[in-house]
Regions:
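Short, small/polar-rich loop/turn modules that mediate ligand/substrate recognition or access, typified
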Residues: 2-50, 55-56, 103-111, 182-198
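Short histidine
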Residues: 3, 94, 135-137
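Signature of lipid phosphatidyltransferase scaffolds
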Residues: 23-27, 34-35, 143, 147-198
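Extracellular/periplasmic catalytic domains that process cell-envelope and extracellular macromolecules
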Residues: 38-40, 63, 90, 120-122, ...
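Structural recognition of the beta-strand scaffold that forms the well-ordered cores
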Residues: 45-47, 70-73, 96-99, 128-129, ...
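Primarily the HKD phosphodiesterase
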Residues: 58-122
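Solvent-exposed loop/turn segments at secondary-structure junctions
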Residues: 75-79, 101-105, 133-136, 147-148, ...
Length: 198
C-alpha cells in the first residue's frame, strides 16, 4: 500500500510541475496526436431515424452541392441517395465514392449494393471499393469543400426505416471539410475502382 501511495505522489508531482521537460514532451505528443481542433463555424443541422428525416437530410446535402461530392460509405443501398448522386452528376457535380468492399461486394446477398454502385459507375461517377481495413466504417459526405455530413447513418434502406441512426451536417465549415477531405483522399488512394458486375 505504501509503495502505491509513493508512486501516486511521484506521478502527481511529475504532472504538477509546469517546468518538467518530460511533461512537456508528453503534452506535446498528446497535443500533436492525430486529432484536430478548430473554431466552431457554419451552421449545424441534425436528423435521426427511423423515419425522422435522416435520409432526407443526406439527400438535401447532395442536392445542395454545386461542384463536387466526396463520399465515404460502409453500407450503400439507399435508392434515394443513389438517385440524388445521379442527379448531382447530371448537373455537372463531380461525384466520388469510396465504399467498403466486403459489405457491398463480396458478401452473399449484396445484390442491392452492387446495383447501387453499378448505377453510379454507369452515370459516370468515380466509384471505388476499399478492403485494406477490417471494415471501412466511415459514413461521410464532403460537399463543395464547405459542408460535411456525418453520423451513424449508413446509406441504406435499413438505416432510414429500421435502425436508430443519426445524421449531423455542418454547413459552411471549410476548415472541417478540409480535414475530412484529407481523410477521404487517403482512403481513395487505398481503394480500387469498382468493377461492374453483370
Amino acid at each position: 500500500m505504501k509503495k502505491i501511495l509513493v508512486v501516486l505522489i511521484v506521478i502527481a508531482l511529475f504532472f504538477a510541475s509546469e517546468r518538467s521537460e518530460a511533461r512537456k514532451g508528453i503534452m506535446g505528443w498528446i497535443e500533436s496526436s492525430h486529432s484536430f481542433t478548430m473554431p466552431a463555424a457554419g451552421e449545424i443541422e441534425v436528423a435521426f431515424s427511423p423515419e425522422e428525416g435522416a435520409e432526407e437530410l443526406v439527400v438535401k446535402v447532395i442536392d445542395s452541392s454545386r461542384s463536387e461530392i466526396k463520399m465515404l460509405a460502409y453500407s450503400f443501398t439507399s435508392a434515394p441517395v443513389v438517385e440524388a448522386l445521379v442527379r448531382a452528376k447530371k448537373r455537372g457535380v463531380a461525384v466520388s465514392l469510396v465504399a467498403n468492399y466486403k459489405s457491398n461486394v463480396s458478401e452473399e446477398g449484396r445484390g442491392k449494393s452492387r446495383a447501387a454502385l453499378s448505377t453510379l459507375v454507369n452515370a459516370g461517377c468515380d466509384v471505388r471499393v476499399i478492403s485494406v481495413y477490417q471494415i471501412h466504417h466511415d459514413k461521410v459526405i464532403i460537399a463543395d469543400r464547405q459542408t460535411v455530413e456525418l453520423g451513424s447513418f449508413n446509406y441504406s434502406a435499413a438505416a432510414a426505416h429500421k435502425n436508430s441512426e443519426n445524421v449531423l451536417v455542418n454547413w459552411h465549415n471549410s476548415k472541417l471539410a478540409e480535414v475530412y477531405l484529407s481523410h477521404f483522399e487517403r482512403n481513395q488512394r487505398q481503394a480500387n475502382p469498382y468493377q461492374l458486375q453483370y
